[in-house]
Curated annotation (Swiss-Prot):
Record's bilayer topology term: Multi-pass membrane protein
Compartmental location: Golgi apparatus membrane; Cell membrane; Apical cell membrane; Membrane raft
Pfam families: PMP22_Claudin (PF00822)
Gene: EMP2
Descriptive protein name: Epithelial membrane protein 2
Organism of this sequence: Bos taurus
Ranges that cross the membrane: 1-21, 67-87, 95-115, 143-163
Length: 167
């Protein structure tokens, strides 16, 4: 039982770490001479421009930013609630509240990654002056980490739903 508990805790912390890196790091769209994410666009590693309301379709970028931040916060809250429930639940009860919050984090990261997947090309085309040198890029590791975090949070949310408290 102790090994299972340790695995669940490590799995959850890994999910939170993946979400943090995917949200913070500047590598959602990368190329040889540039990298761009949901916060800024950098060309030649020196010329960085923050994304602000002057960017067309900034509301789309803000939706991705907000849902990634929300997913990270929800994942951390789910972990704290899990620890609280670990000591408060009666024997045999399920970690339903933790599961619901973790699945909400999963939903948020899925929404963010899906919006970015769908709208990235439109944002780049509508803001040619900002994204002029980013046409030859590909999805970066932060984008991939967001999808991996989606899978991790989904699995952990299901794990919490199935899990019952034992002695």
């Amino acid at each position: 039982m102790l090994v299972l508990l340790a695995f669940i805790i490590v799995f959850h912390i890994t999910s939170a770490a993946l979400l943090l890196v995917a949200t913070i790091d500047n590598a959602w769209w990368v190329g040889e001479e540039f990298f761009a994410d949901i916060w800024k666009v950098c060309v030649n590693n020196t010329n960085c421009t923050e994304l602000n309301d002057s960017v067309q379709d900034f509301s789309t970028v803000q939706a991705v930013q907000a849902t990634m931040i929300l997913s990270t916060i929800l994942c951390c809250i789910a972990f704290l609630i899990f620890l609280l429930q670990l000591f408060r639940l009666k024997q045999g009860e399920r970690f339903v509240l933790t599961s619901i919050i973790q699945l909400m984090a999963c939903l948020c990261v899925m929404i963010a990654a899906s919006i970015y997947t769908d709208r990235r090309k439109d944002i780049h085309e509508k803001n040619e002056e900002l994204y002029a040198q980013t046409s030859g890029g590909s999805f970066g590791y932060s984008f991939i980490l967001a999808w991996v975090a989606f899978a991790f949070t989904f699995i952990s949310g299901l794990m919490y739903l199935i899990l019952r408290k034992r002695k």
